[in-house]
Amino acid sequence: MRPRITFRPLHGILLLDKPAGLSSNNALQAARRLLRAEKGGHTGSLDPLATGLLPLCFGEATKIAGLLLGSAKAYDADIVLGVTTDTDDADGQPLRERPVPALSEAALQAALAPFIGRIQQQAPIYSALKQGGEPLYAKARRGEVIEAPVREVEVHAITLTSYASPRLRLRVTCGSGTYIRSLARDLGEALGCGAHIAALRRVWVEPFRTPEMITLEALTALVESGADAAQLLLPVAAGLSDFAQITLDATLVARFRMGQRLRDPAFPEGQVAVFDTDGSPAGLGLVDADGRLSPQRLFNGLNAAAAC
C-alpha cells in the first residue's frame, strides 16, 4: 500500500520539462505529489506528444497561472509532409498520403508567410476546447462529426530551421491559443500535400525566455535522495517580471490589501505588480488613465526572502 502523502503549503513556480506521452494534468499531479504541495495548477496544456516547458504554479502562484496562460510562447516543430492524420500529429491514425512536391527554401518561405501575423485558425478536432461543455476530443473519440471552432490567433514569427524532404523543422513564436498542429495541417494543405506534426517541443514561455527546466525523473531522484525539492521553486515574483512594478510603503500596502483604490499620477497606466518596500509581492492591480490603482489579485503569506 502506497504511504499516505502529507501535503504542505508551498508557493512558487516550477519549470518542468514535460515528457512525451504524458498529459499536462498528469505531469502536474506527479510533480505536486513529489513536492507534497497542497495546491497546484499549470499554465496551459501541452499536447501529450509534446515535450518542453510547462510552468507549474503552486500555492499563491496559482493566482498568476492565467496570466502565464495568455503569454507568448515559442515551439520547435518537426513536421512531416505528405501524410495527414486524424489528430494532426504522429499520435493519430493516417488519413491520406500524397506525393510531396519538389520545394525550394524560397518556396517554403513563401508558403509560410501567410501564417505570420493575426490569422484565422481552425482548432484540431482532437483538442481540449469545449463545445457544449464537453472537450472536442471526447466527441471525436466517439466518432461524432465535429465542426471545430475557427478563432483569431497571432503568430509572431516562423523560422525555417531545416528542411530535408519530407521533414522540416520550424521555430514558431506565437500568442495564446495558437495550435501548432493546426499550423502544420494548414501549411501542408497550402503546399498541396498535407502534413502532420512528428514532434513538438515548447522552448520558452514569457517571461521564462531561458528556462532552467527539470524533468520528472530528475525531480524524483532529488526527492529520493532526501533533498527538499521545494528549493527548485522560483518565487512568485519571477512570474511578474514582465509587468510594470509599483513599490508601496507598509501603510499603502495595507490599504491596497483592504481593497482600497490608491491614486498617484506617477503610477504607470495598465496592469501592474505591486510590491512592499522589502521586495515581497503584494498583488496585481490595474491603473487607470487618472493614476488610480485598483487591486485585482492579492498575494498572501509571501516574503522577499523565500519562494515558498
From Swiss-Prot:
It is an enzyme of class 5 (isomerase). It holds the Pfam family TruB_N. It comes from the Bacteria. It catalyses: uridine(55) in tRNA = pseudouridine(55) in tRNA. CDD domains: PseudoU_synth_EcTruB (cd02573), PUA_TruB_bacterial (cd21152). Keywords: Isomerase, tRNA processing. InterPro entries: PsdUridine_synth_cat_dom_sf, PsdUridine_synth_N, PUA-like_sf, PUA_sf, tRNA_psdUridine_synth_TruB, tRNA_sdUridine_synth_fam1_C, TruB_C. The active site is at D47. Its EC number is 5.4.99.25. GO terms for biological process: mRNA pseudouridine synthesis; tRNA pseudouridine synthesis. GO terms for molecular function: RNA binding; tRNA pseudouridine(55) synthase activity. HAMAP family: TruB_bact. Belongs to the pseudouridine synthase TruB family. Type 1 subfamily. Responsible for synthesis of pseudouridine from uracil-55 in the psi GC loop of transfer RNAs. This is tRNA pseudouridine synthase B. The gene is truB.
